Amino acid sequence: MTHPVKAAVFGTGSWGTAFAVILADAGCEVTLWGRRAEVAEAINTTHTNPDYLPGIALPDSVRATTDAAEALRGADFAFLVVPSQTLRANLADWAPHLEPDTVLVSLMKGVELGTAELMSEVIADVAKVPADRIAVVSGPNLAKEIAERRPAAAVVACADESVAQRLQAACHTSYFRPYTNTDVVGCELGGAVKNVIGLAVGIADGMGLGDNTKGSLITRGLAETTRLGLAMGADPLTFSGLAGLGDLVATCSSPLSRNHTFGTNLGRGMTLQETIAVTKQTAEGVKSCESVLDLARRHGVDMPITETVVSIVHEGKSPVVAVKELMSRSAKPERR
């Protein structure tokens, strides 16, 4: 008789907690790691996470700890769900406790500042594990809806198809349907760049520019993502799937999206600092827009929407001026 899959989830924010619900419902033994003792205590005693998923009852089988070694003991999978810019430092602390066969799974959607590395590359750098022990999960997965067990689908990607299939089985439930893929780069890029496009659409919504603008930004944003993906060796079909178009549509259309909400506040006239002050959780696109643009320039890829977001968020350009400049670029064929 095989033992239940053991899963460690590193991060007690809304997405980490929601994914712990999926894993528990799929029959895994789940340990949530969190830095704050009071959050771990609340999860263990009240089976809720009042800070990040208030009102959601967690399965009794989900337990929490602040001890990384305890969380990783016997783990088949370690799911990493921290802000992407903190992964390197956090993983350096956790890596000494990894067991030889534990598969590291990124649930993060970002590109590291300075190095322009994808999260899978940061994992490989820090944990010194081969590609068949690194996987990613990506797709249209807004945490609150997942925690409420509303139907959703996602992509689980690993260079080793058999590992992707094991991961698929570990998180397949009646409401969460994962599909396998071996295009790790494509799945990660889809998730990282959609945060930037989500900011752009949010800014446009905050300015009251309308649905034509939104549709144009989503479509041309997907074109930017695909161009970068092709330059990095990704499969272009990945971007028409759940990790590309699916995630992009959810982020650009939902009030639950942190990046869309952040952009909306900027478009309404808030300053960057004012918007940060009213945002409770990390909007990955705020920092990743710079690293995505860095990555694009390293590969010689033109990403004008991303450039526009960077100019508004980090260079103080007026959204009105930025939109005018974006629309005034020289005309060109669509497929470029």
Curated annotation (Swiss-Prot):
Keywords: Cytoplasm, Lipid biosynthesis, Lipid metabolism, NAD, NADP, Nucleotide-binding, Oxidoreductase, Phospholipid biosynthesis, Phospholipid metabolism. NADPH binds at residues 14-15, 35-36, 109, 143, 258, 284. Pathway: Membrane lipid metabolism; glycerophospholipid metabolism. The keyword Glycoprotein does not apply. It comes from the Bacteria. GO terms for molecular function: glycerol-3-phosphate dehydrogenase [NAD(P)+] activity; NAD binding. One of its GO terms (biological process) is phospholipid biosynthetic process. The active site is at 194 (proton acceptor). The keyword NAD applies. GO terms for cellular component: cytosol. It catalyses: sn-glycerol 3-phosphate + NAD(+) = dihydroxyacetone phosphate + NADH + H(+); sn-glycerol 3-phosphate + NADP(+) = dihydroxyacetone phosphate + NADPH + H(+). Sn-glycerol 3-phosphate binds at residues 109, 139, 194, 247, 257-259. It is found in: Cytoplasm. It is an enzyme of class 1 (oxidoreductase). Its EC number is 1.1.1.94. Belongs to the NAD-dependent glycerol-3-phosphate dehydrogenase family. Catalyzes the reduction of the glycolytic intermediate dihydroxyacetone phosphate (DHAP) to sn-glycerol 3-phosphate (G3P), the key precursor for phospholipid synthesis. This is Glycerol-3-phosphate dehydrogenase [NAD(P)+]. It comes from Streptomyces griseus subsp. griseus (strain JCM 4626 / CBS 651.72 / NBRC 13350 / KCC S-0626 / ISP 5235). The lineage of its organism: Bacteria, Bacillati, Actinomycetota, Actinomycetes, Kitasatosporales.
